[in-house]
């Protein structure tokens, strides 16, 4: 009995256990089903942001941080609008309504994922929004404005592109045939199975 208790005591001193949340270290093993995206909403009823709202969205994730307020809303843009009206609001969790529900659930947050990234967790039927702001006219850029003035953009003709592909393909075939000859000819080639 004494030997058994000493063995158990020595085993417990060597073993250590920790508890980790799913999102802390293994979140990369469960990638989001949808990629993050930019969200732009328009609401003609509210004059706070006449050009609409602009936000960064991360679907199927929520932030479990300090909440400013909670409410039920019909659409996610109402949730974003409430956040834009409150200066302390930095981010929003929007929980989409289930089949039996008519309204979604909104959480206004006083901090975001950049404040504490470990508080981001995967969560189905929810979307995390951050960087919520009024959309400015400068947010929309034309293609001509995006290119620098001094840069020269030249487009290749389809004939040139086809010719380059043929040249690349012929170079590849030459290299491949040289490697096959080297493999077959050098070092005895293939050996018969014994």
Curated annotation (Swiss-Prot):
Annotated PAN domain residues: 49-134
Pfam families: PAN_1 (PF00024)
SUPFAM superfamilies, per the entry: Hairpin loop containing domain-like
Keywords: Disulfide bond, Signal
Disulfide bonds, paired cysteine numbers: 49-134, 79-106
Signal sequence interval, chain numbering: 1-15
InterPro entries from the UniProt entry: Pan_app
Superkingdom classification of source: Eukaryota
Name of the featured protein: Uncharacterized protein B0361.9
Source organism of the structure: Caenorhabditis elegans
Top-level taxonomy: Eukaryota, Metazoa, Ecdysozoa, Nematoda, Chromadorea
